[in-house]
Amino acid sequence: MARYRCCRSPSRSRCRRRRRRCRRRRRRSCRRRRRVCCRRYTVRCRRR
């Protein structure tokens, strides 16, 4: 199981904001932007 890095930027707030954005979008979008999504969300998105 490959784990994706949460966010390259050290700011967590930015990561949360991006995770929210990913959460709102559909799976396909989330998959395409998995680099932007947080690790937890990416894993969830991947499972589905």
From Swiss-Prot:
Q: Give a brief account of the tissues where this protein occurs.
A: Testis.
Cellular component (GO) terms are: nucleosome; nucleus
Q: Which UniProt keywords apply?
A: Chromosome, Developmental protein, Differentiation, DNA condensation, DNA-binding, Nucleosome core, Nucleus, Spermatogenesis
The residues forming the signal peptide are none
Q: Name one GO biological process term.
A: sperm DNA condensation
Which molecular function terms from Gene Ontology are attached?
Answer: DNA binding
Coiled-coil parts of chain? none
Q: What is its main location?
A: nucleus
Annotated localization: Nucleus; Chromosome
Q: Which family does it belong to?
A: Belongs to the protamine P1 family.
What does the record give as the function of this protein?
Answer: Protamines substitute for histones in the chromatin of sperm during the haploid phase of spermatogenesis. They compact sperm DNA into a highly condensed, stable and inactive complex.
Q: Return the protein name.
A: Sperm protamine P1
Originating organism = Mormoops megalophylla
Q: Which gene encodes it?
A: PRM1
